[in-house]
Amino acid sequence: MSEKQQSSSIIEEFGFPAEVIQLLDRTGVTGEVTQVRVRVLEGRDKGRILTRNIKGPVRLGDIVILRETEREARKLTTKR
C-alpha cells in the first residue's frame, strides 16, 4: 500500500479535517452551539465549504475533524 493510499484510509477512518473560516451564529437553548462555515482540507471533498454546528468553544482558524462531509446544517431562523 502506498503512503498516499495509507494516509487517505487513515483520514477516512477518523474523519476529515476542516478549517473554520467564518463564525455565523449561536444556537441551542443556552447558546452552547455555534454555527460555522468550514473548508474541508483533505479527502474526496477537499476545498468544499460547508455550514456545520459545533458544540464547545471554537475560533476562526481552528481545525475540526468532521466524521462525514455529506450533510450541512440548516440555516438558523428566528422566532417571531
Swiss-Prot record:
Disulfide bonds: none annotated. GO terms for biological process: maturation of SSU-rRNA; ribosomal small subunit assembly; translation. GO terms for cellular component: cytosolic small ribosomal subunit. Transmembrane segments: none annotated. GO terms for molecular function: structural constituent of ribosome. Keywords: Ribonucleoprotein, Ribosomal protein. InterPro entries: NA-bd_OB-fold, Ribosomal_eS28, Ribosomal_eS28_CS. HAMAP family: Ribosomal_eS28. Belongs to the eukaryotic ribosomal protein eS28 family. This is Small ribosomal subunit protein eS28. It comes from Metallosphaera sedula (strain ATCC 51363 / DSM 5348 / JCM 9185 / NBRC 15509 / TH2).
